[in-house]
Amino acid sequence: MSLTEIQKKELRGRGHALKPVVSIGNSGLSKAVLRELELSLEHHDLMKIKIGGAERDERKKIIEQICTTFNTELVQAIGHIALVYHKLDD
């Protein structure tokens, strides 16, 4: 799945008003966080994830792991907040 720049722009606009659905703390991607991400992605096609307590490179690795594990597309990452898109099954 690959989003065009036009699609990303539209998704960024939709995501602007969203609050983070999942917060990842100092422990990183624990089993509980992965389970919460999985449950959240069943109900949200677009969601913000807050990644706290990590350096820039570590945050990037966490985002890549989330995108790979859950087949999501990174729309935008600013600071500690990542906006990801996941196409919901009909």
Please give the residue ranges for each predicted region.
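Positively charged, polar, low-complexity stretches
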Residues: 1-90
